[in-house]
Amino acid sequence: MPMKIRLGMMIFSIIFILILPVSLWGQSKKLPALKQEAVQEVDKLKDFTQQMVDMIFSFGELGFQEFETSRYITTILRENGFSVEEGVSGMPTAWVARWGQGNPVIAFGSDIDCIPKASQKPGVAYHDPIIEGAPGHGEGHNSGQAVNVTAALVLKRLMEREKIAGTLMLWPGVAEEQLGAKAYFARDGVMKDVDAVLFTHVSDNLGVSFGPDSSGTGLVSVEYTFKGSSAHSAGAPWRGRSALDAVELMNIGWNFRREHLRLSQRSHYVILNGGDQPNVVPSLATVWYYFREVDYENIKKSFEIGNKIAQAAAMMTDTEVSWRILGAAWPRHFSKPIALAMYDNIKQVGLPAWSEGDQTLAKALQRELGNKETNGLKTKLTDPPRLYQGRNFGGGSDDIGDISWTAPTITLRFPSNIPDLPGHHWANAVAMATPIAHKGATAGAKVMALTTLDLLLNAKLVEQSWAYFKNEQGKETQYQSFLSAEDKPSIHLNREIMAKHRPEMRKYYFDPSKHKTYLEQLGITYPTTRESADKKTQ
């Protein structure tokens, strides 16, 4: 190659290399002003955020059946220029939405499913279901996508105007209550090109953590099916082989074994099928187990013990047993660099200004539940995140754990609910379509927007998060999925329950063209307490 050409190419390469940092440096100088503008823009969208919170609350869909919710969110995203891929990992309600070009790729996730039998009128501080026995948002999963979509729309406007490189990716936590989706996303490489994952989850404060989970577990969700042979329960019971007997013996065996397991394990089961009627020996019976532990090896051991006990129960009853994994969740590990950056933004945003009505509702609900403390909503931020040095004695699980082992991940906890509630309960739905949830979601959207700007305009933060991911988080632990290549999502779950309740629930879907809020549509005076309701009826 001639010397002049080589020299020209070298000069061009040097200039090209220099231009990118200079451009990014120029944009990063604007970061404080862009952050201030982002906060203002989120505030301008607070009515939109409120509508999303209320609409998804009114759908109240159980895991794998979140059709209305996914249709609603993806319609909004398409209308705002996002491309949407549906049916991700074989799940009809799973999707991935993208906008932008190039790196970094920032993925926003939040769960969308609800809780069985948790139907509840919002803003009412005692049990008063919208529809008796119907599902409802008794964990508050109606709020997180409103946080993410609001932040994404604000960021899109700023990125377009400022010509900021990067890609925004939004996705739903489908069937989180069944731990049914995110392990499949991880297995199938949905996050393979992602630079950082910002997940959101409802809480009673603004907060973020890093490092190994201090009070949570991973799990494997397993369905055991026993097959026997039927017979007349009175006329010829000796000719039958009871699958239900096998289920009961498995449960008894597991319950005796509990004493000899680690303190950090948690396990629970429900009998899905115990037979048809008493005078027929059950030829088929099914039990569903969650085996929880604080690390992969001990989750696997619990699963193996459960399998042995199931086989023993089958031998005792002369039945056959098979099992299949319905879902799984790895223990969570969150990114220190991103968490510290996010906490700086949390301090900048601060907690919402709660009204007297907000506090009245919170305190009344706490009294209704018999709580020792009835101090209402939090008015002080959580402490800065720090590495937990104590022992993890177990707790709940979230399949965001699997995602956290595929890319640097954090979970933003935002203040849309009331402190000290039971969880998975009608009480956790009381605040979730009220000003408490609306204000908390707006605060969360601000933190998400600010932290994403940090990642977009500070390449060093992305580099640090990956260094932590590889050198600290992955130093001694390597992710191994509980799923095989043949395992498929359990999309049959909750189908019959939703088919039963959805026709009646449709009558109560929020209509923002006629009503400003869901409270207004339902005719609820905010807040409604036992005392105020009693006065109204006198």
Model regions and ranges:
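Soluble non-cytosolic domains of exported or imported proteins
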Residues: 43-47, 63-71, 142, 146, ...
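Short, flexible, mixed-charge acidic loops at enzyme active sites
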Residues: 118-127, 213-218, 421-424
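Histidine/acidic-residue-rich, glycine-tolerant segments that coordinate divalent metal ions
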Residues: 127-136, 142-143, 160-282, 292, ...
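Metal-dependent amide/peptide-bond hydrolase catalytic core
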Residues: 245-538
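Acidic/His- and Gly-rich active-site-bordering loop/insert found
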Residues: 28-137, 146-167
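Bacterial N-terminal signal peptides
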Residues: 10-23
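Divalent metal-coordination and catalytic microenvironments
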Residues: 56, 97, 108, 141, ...
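Bacterial N-terminal signal peptides that target proteins for export
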Residues: 1-12
